[in-house]
């Protein structure tokens, strides 16, 4: 009923870690700008980008601060774009010092929306899988939204209802920086040493991908590739809470529970 719904909404507000906080959004690409638009009337928001001059035409001039101003402000939260390498950027010292305050737009999304979500990650095939799944859900008349690395930034969606389902393509960088994001359904397609780059080594890259699975509760489900040796080896050495469903891609995608 309406009263129960109101109680749930009030609880969500009490639990929200971003409402009313002093927040720095670092990186003014698509995800950074959408984070600003979403949070601007919910928190005290400031902006920074390594290339400030290029970003002054976004109509956000009064909110953009320079390096000296940023270093003098005590922020509660720092939301960074996944493209930023915290060890090689203009705010590197500040980010290292405030590492526990770093979040992503995925964290903001999760703190405001508790809808069912299906989050897809892996080295290869994320976009194709996300698109296919989104099309299947639309075909079955679900209110599906394709967001993340593909489609809209996660905070740019409008007219969200309780029935909205989110199909999220998540990169290892997004997952690595996220602190509270979790998902009802996780899909881990594969892991290979193709996109290690900023992660420095395979171990860090694998750990970033596995954050998606480690964050899940016992009410969640993870679909993993039975034929991927790196995934299977990591699964053996982790006590995961959720239901694990293995998909055999070499045998007509047979499902093994």
Give residue ranges: language-model regions:
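Short, solvent-exposed coil/turn elements at secondary-structure transition points
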Residues: 51, 68-70, 108, 150, ...
């Amino acid at each position: 009923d309406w009263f129960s719904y109101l109680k749930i909404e009030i609880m969500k507000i009490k639990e929200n870690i971003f409402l009313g906080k002093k927040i720095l959004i670092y990186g003014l690409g698509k995800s950074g700008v959408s984070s600003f638009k979403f949070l601007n009337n919910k928190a005290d928001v400031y902006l920074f980008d390594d290339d400030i001059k290029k970003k002054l035409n976004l109509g956000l001039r009064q909110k953009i601060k320079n390096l000296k101003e940023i270093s003098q402000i005590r922020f509660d939260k720092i939301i960074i774009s996944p493209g930023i390498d915290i060890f090689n950027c203009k705010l590197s010292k500040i980010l290292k010092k405030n590492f526990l305050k770093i979040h992503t737009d995925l964290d903001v999304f999760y703190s405001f929306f508790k809808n069912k979500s299906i989050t897809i990650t892996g080295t290869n095939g994320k976009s194709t899988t996300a698109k296919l799944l989104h099309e299947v859900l639309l075909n079955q008349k679900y209110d599906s939204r394709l967001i993340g690395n593909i489609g809209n930034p996660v905070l740019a969606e409008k007219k969200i209802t309780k029935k909205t389902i989110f199909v999220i393509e998540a990169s290892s960088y997004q997952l690595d920086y996220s602190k509270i994001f979790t998902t009802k359904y996780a899909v881990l397609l594969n892991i290979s040493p193709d996109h290690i780059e900023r992660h420095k080594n395979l171990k860090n890259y694998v750990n970033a991908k596995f954050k998606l699975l480690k964050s899940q509760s016992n009410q969640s489900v993870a679909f993993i590739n039975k034929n991927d040796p790196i995934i299977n080896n990591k699964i053996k050495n982790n006590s995961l809470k959720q239901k694990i469903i293995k998909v055999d891609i070499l045998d007509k995608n047979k499902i093994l529970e």
